[in-house]
């Protein structure tokens, strides 16, 4: 018996767990009691509890000792004590995977399963199914069928749930129990009906027609179980998504009808299903939103929370649909449950008007200190969305964010605020100086290294372009004096960027950098020495290449290439063009967050997608000597429909003078094996097909890869755009679908694929230039050309910008892909690297009158990339 002071002991942490210091050997020794007669039920049940505790705590039981304990436990079936019998069932289930010859208890369990004691029958079914494998299942099939339709609900449910588990290993046997499951689905018991429907669905889930018939049958006759209704709603919504069904479908009508069910859980499940259906219009959402609106005033906190959480999700895509609930949501702002209040506020922030923002900010500030960091992050994300929606309100929102930044909080919370402030600075030029000033104050007392270095990077990028850049120097240099090495290194880089862009400040910056040369840390000293030497040259090209824009290569790729160079010494200097370019802009790489504690741990450099392709292609003898891989297409191109007999996807790999087309092929016919599979290509331009590398064998549903190597045009190197007609050729061998054995003889066949396009974007790799003007000056005007074009089919600047960026495959710089409102002129700045490692920059001036006129100026370190860009645009 538990004593009265046990609760107090539990709270104090002393003596609360009677099994805390159990030893496996002692417990197994105690298990010998099972062999004694007469059986002591209380003592034996206590020992079984200890064994179960050890197993669930992860204690390893050897096969021999587990088997001995299991066999001893089987003798306890001689006792009729109900508690001991239930403990035996639990022990059988837990030890079924550890002990050997557990089937010895089959007869005892079968006897209990078919006996008159109802309290034994359900657990006996579950235990029996746990020890039964696919070879023994047919022996108990008759008993299982009887149990499924048993009039005792606990027995029927046990059999149905056990059948569901058995589906994984014995699908064909369990499938024969469908008639019994259908009979159980008509039960008046809510759990039996629910479990029966679950079994029926999992048996038929791969047959869409059968699932549709099942839904139709049960929705027509109605269901008694609210759990069954919830499951049918989920099945129906999944079916709607898979079939991309119209909202006129009977399935949607069924889900909508469940909004009028008498059970709250069914009503909520239906509302949740509707709002989560892709492509739902505001009109179709209206009934679900109305139901959720009613739940907002429910006396049950769980219902209010569910409603406001779902409305919050709806507001992300359809804020206008939730506007009708604003009054109810405002009432929830003062809810005693802070989670509900926070969700209500963030939903209002997404749906509220511009005029209500000030009032909402005051309401939020009244309880921000009372909610957890997790919900504070939700509030910050809502404010970020609001800044994009109402840019004129950025001053009010930024002041609120700055007050939040000064409060106590964890890393994720502070990072969310900093992210939001930076996004406001990037979107609103007039907020830049205010935002930078507040961030300067924040890093004066910032405990998070990742955030401090990120803000210093931002100051180095944006600070020199402000009206009074010198005011930021004090804050940056304070970091050099007061912070640890990682932040000091970031501060040195930021100082160098000010010196590289402002000649008046250069002497002062050089003085500060000379002080940093004596730093204790190697990284800080090296950076200061490097930047000092570059800045003292007073050359814009050097500043742009080594300070303002830096390397655009993959850092893991650079590490691997340098390691390989040291392992295989060469008289030739290291060639930076052999390193793959960064697949993501470096600005994005720097902002990726890493926990501060993990920053100093050695990391294993993961191979990028392009490096994996590089290794795969280098292993093909025909591709030796092609040089480093320049670019792989970001997404494979589908050359067949997904439902056809052969599924072919192509990835384009670009080298300096060649292209390799990688065809990933899947044969979906189970009565055929394909051999010597190649894709024959016919180019429309001066490309030359050099060789085909076949996929030797393509069995059913096993992917294989073949390649086609082509040489780039030499006579007219500007003709890079090309259309290839593709035909897959192969040898077909018929095979037995069951065994997979193919015939010895085969026959030649072919399959026409979709045409494959090669565009200028396949020859240019995106590169981010943080300072486009510096990069423009660095490249110089030796190879500069300019032409004017009319885009007659395009009617807006936004459309023109989007089309140009996509067509050229270059990276928009300095947020020039964002077109300001109510403007009829815009300048788009694009940067990239042409195959061979040549920088290519494009400045495109756009003018909107009746159509869009575009003046394109291109610069490169070589003439060919400029000619190709202008020829492609023309």
UniProtKB/Swiss-Prot annotation:
Q: Which Gene3D superfamilies match?
A: Coatomer, gamma subunit, appendage domain, Leucine-rich Repeat Variant, TATA-Binding Protein
InterPro entries reported for this sequence: ARM-like, ARM-type_fold, Clathrin/coatomer_adapt-like_N, Clathrin_app_Ig-like_sf, Coatomer/calthrin_app_sub_C, Coatomer_g_Cpla, Coatomer_gsu, Coatomer_gsu_app_Ig-like_dom
The compartments listed are: Cytoplasm, Cytosol; Golgi apparatus membrane; Cytoplasmic vesicle, COPI-coated vesicle membrane
Q: Which GO terms describe its biological process?
A: endoplasmic reticulum to Golgi vesicle-mediated transport; intra-Golgi vesicle-mediated transport; intracellular protein transport; organelle transport along microtubule; protein secretion; retrograde vesicle-mediated transport, Golgi to endoplasmic reticulum
User: Which GO molecular function annotation, any one, does this entry have?
Assistant: structural molecule activity
Whether Repeat counts among this entry's keywords is: yes
Q: Would you tell me the protein name for this molecule?
A: Coatomer subunit gamma-1
């Amino acid at each position: 018996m538990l004593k009265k002071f046990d609760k107090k002991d539990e709270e104090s942490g002393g003596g609360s767990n009677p099994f805390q210091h159990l030893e496996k050997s002692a417990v197994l020794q105690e298990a010998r009691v099972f062999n004694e007669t007469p059986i002591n039920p209380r003592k034996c049940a206590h020992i079984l509890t200890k064994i179960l505790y050890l197993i669930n705590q992860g204690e390893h039981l050897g096969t021999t000792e587990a088997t001995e304990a299991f066999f001893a436990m089987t003798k306890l079936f001689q006792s009729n004590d109900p508690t001991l019998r239930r403990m035996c069932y639990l022990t059988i289930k837990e030890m079924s995977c550890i002990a050997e010859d557990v089937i010895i208890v089959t007869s005892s369990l079968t006897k209990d399963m078919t006996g008159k004691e109802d309290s034994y029958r359900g657990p006996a079914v579950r235990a029996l199914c746990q020890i039964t494998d696919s070879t023994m299942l047919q022996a108990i099939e008759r008993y299982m069928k009887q149990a499924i339709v048993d009039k005792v609900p606990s027995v029927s449910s046990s059999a149905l749930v056990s059948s569901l588990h058995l589906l994984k290993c014995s699908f064909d046997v369990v499938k024969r129990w469908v008639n019994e499951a259908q009979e159980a689905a008509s039960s008046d018991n809510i759990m039996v009906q629910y479990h029966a429907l679950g079994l029926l669905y999992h048996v038929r889930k791969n047959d869409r027609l059968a699932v549709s018939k099942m839904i139709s049958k049960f929705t027509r006759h109605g269901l008694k179980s609210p759990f069954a209704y919830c499951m049918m709603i989920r099945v129906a919504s999944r079916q709607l998504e898979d079939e991309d069904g119209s909202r006129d479908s009977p399935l949607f009508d069924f889900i909508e009808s469940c909004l009028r069910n008498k059970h709250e859980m069914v009503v909520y499940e239906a509302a949740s299903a509707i709002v989560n259906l892709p492509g739902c219009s505001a009109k179709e959402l209206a009934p679900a939103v109305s139901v959720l609106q009613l739940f907002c005033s429910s006396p049950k906190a769980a219902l209010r929370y569910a409603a406001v959480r779902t409305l919050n999700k709806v507001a992300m895509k359809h804020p206008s649909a939730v506007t009708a609930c604003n009054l109810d949501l405002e009432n929830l702002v003062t809810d005693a449950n802070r989670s509900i209040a926070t969700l209500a506020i963030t939903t209002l922030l997404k749906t509220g008007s511009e005029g209500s923002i000030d009032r909402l900010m005051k309401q939020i500030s009244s309880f921000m200190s009372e909610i957890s960091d997790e919900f504070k992050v939700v509030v910050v994300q809502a404010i970020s969305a609001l800044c994009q929606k109402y840019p004129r309100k950025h001053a009010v929102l930024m002041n609120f964010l700055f007050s939040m930044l000064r409060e106590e909080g964890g890393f994720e919370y502070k990072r969310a605020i900093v992210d939001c402030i930076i996004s406001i600075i990037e979107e609103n030029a007039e907020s830049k100086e205010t935002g930078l000033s507040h961030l300067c104050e924040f890093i004066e007392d910032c405990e998070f290294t990742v955030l401090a270095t990120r803000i210093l990077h931002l100051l180095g990028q944006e600070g020199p372009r402000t009206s009074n850049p010198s005011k930021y120097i004090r804050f940056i240099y304070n970091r050099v004096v007061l912070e640890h090495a990682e932040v000091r290194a970031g501060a040195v880089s930021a100082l160098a960027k000010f010196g590289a862009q402002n000649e008046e400040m250069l002497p002062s910056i050089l003085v500060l950098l000379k002080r940093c040369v004596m730093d204790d840390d190697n990284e800080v000293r090296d950076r200061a020495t490097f930047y000092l030497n570059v800045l003292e040259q007073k050359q814009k090209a050097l500043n742009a290449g080594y300070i303002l824009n830096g390397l655009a290569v993959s850092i893991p790729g650079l590490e691997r290439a340098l390691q390989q160079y040291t392992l295989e010494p060469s008289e030739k200097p290291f060639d930076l063009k052999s390193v793959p370019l960064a697949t993501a802009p470096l600005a994005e790489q720097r902002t990726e967050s890493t926990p501060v504690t993990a920053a100093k741990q050695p990391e294993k450099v993961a191979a990028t997608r392009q490096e994996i392709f590089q290794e795969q292609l280098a292993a093909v003898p025909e591709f030796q000597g092609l040089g480093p891989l320049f670019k792989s297409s970001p997404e494979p191109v589908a050359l067949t429909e997904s439902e056809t007999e052969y599924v072919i996807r192509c990835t384009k790999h670009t080298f300096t003078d060649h292209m390799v087309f990688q065809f990933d092929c899947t044969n979906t016919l189970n009565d055929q094996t394909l051999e010597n599979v190649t894709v024959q290509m016919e180019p429309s331009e001066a490309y030359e097909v050099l060789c085909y590398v076949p996929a030797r064998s393509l069995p059913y549903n096993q992917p294989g890869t073949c390649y086609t190597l082509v040489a780039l045009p030499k006579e007219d190197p500007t003709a890079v755009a090309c259309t290839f007609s593709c035909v897959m050729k192969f040898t077909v061998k018929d095979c037995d679908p069951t065994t997979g054995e193919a015939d010895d003889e085969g026959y030649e066949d072919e399959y026409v694929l979709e045409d494959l396009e090669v565009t200028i974007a396949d020859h240019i790799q995106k590169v981010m230039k943080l300072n486009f003007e510096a990069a423009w000056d660095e490249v110089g005007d030796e190879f500069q050309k300019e032409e004017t074009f009319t885009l007659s089919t395009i009617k807006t600047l936004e459309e023109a910008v989007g089309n140009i960026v996509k067509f050229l495959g270059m990276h928009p710089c300095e947020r020039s892909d964002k077109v300001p409102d109510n403007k009829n002129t815009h300048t788009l700045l694009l940067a990239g690297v042409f195959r061979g490692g040549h920088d290519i920059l494009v400045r495109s001036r756009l003018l909107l009158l009746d159509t869009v006129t575009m003046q394109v100026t291109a610069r490169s370190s070589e003439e060919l990339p400029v000619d190709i860009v202008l020829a492609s645009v023309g």
